[in-house]
């Protein structure tokens, strides 16, 4: 593995343990050339998962797209990047546990909203407004009213 500091092609593993999600291994490495220490994660290669979009087109599942949407919805909100990453991890795990080769973008969107709602309601509303494509202000207010009813 290339050292991120000196780009030498050689490192040794100092420590290895399961990552928090149980789906990967976290390894601490040390460059044999410069002694720089860095962390890598090893994951098994998964079978391709296709997302069926609203228009019927298919594209390969991309966890980064989920994370980008979460970051946009939580902009200027007190939600850490670590928390958003964990949400993306949970959503990906839920999607993969379905055991299907294809999953609709609607299912993924619902999973994201279920994870985001208890974390930050403003970020949730922002995400929902894009995901559900509110046509007007009334649709926006209906979503807020439904949230209020659930709190009671």
Curated annotation (Swiss-Prot):
Residues 49-139 form the ATP-cone domain. One of its GO terms (biological process) is negative regulation of DNA-templated transcription. InterPro entries: ATP-cone_dom, NrdR-like_N, RNR_NrdR-like. Negatively regulates transcription of bacterial ribonucleotide reductase nrd genes and operons by binding to NrdR-boxes. Its cofactor is Zn(2+). This is Transcriptional repressor NrdR. Binds 1 zinc ion. Pfam families: ATP-cone, Zn_ribbon_NrdR. Belongs to the NrdR family. GO terms for molecular function: ATP binding; DNA binding; zinc ion binding. Keywords: ATP-binding, DNA-binding, Metal-binding, Nucleotide-binding, Repressor, Transcription, Transcription regulation, Zinc, Zinc-finger. A zinc finger (unnamed) spans 3-34.
């Amino acid at each position: 593995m290339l050292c991120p500091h000196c780009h030498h092609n050689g490192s040794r593993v100092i420590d290895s343990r399961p990552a928090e999600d149980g789906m990967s291994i976290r390894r601490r490495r040390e460059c044999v050339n410069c002694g720089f220490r860095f962390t890598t994660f090893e994951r098994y290669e998964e079978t391709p998962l296709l997302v069926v979009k609203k228009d019927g087109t298919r594209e390969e599942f991309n966890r980064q797209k989920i994370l980008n949407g979460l970051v946009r919805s939580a902009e200027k909100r007190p939600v850490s990047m670590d928390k958003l990453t964990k949400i993306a991890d949970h959503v990906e795990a839920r999607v993969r546990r379905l055991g299907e080769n294809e999953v609709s973008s609607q299912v993924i969107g619902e999973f994201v909203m279920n994870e985001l709602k208890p974390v930050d309601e403003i970020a949730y509303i922002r995400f929902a407004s894009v995901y559900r494509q509110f046509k007007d202000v009334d649709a926006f207010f209906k979503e807020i009213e439904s949230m209020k009813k659930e709190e009671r």
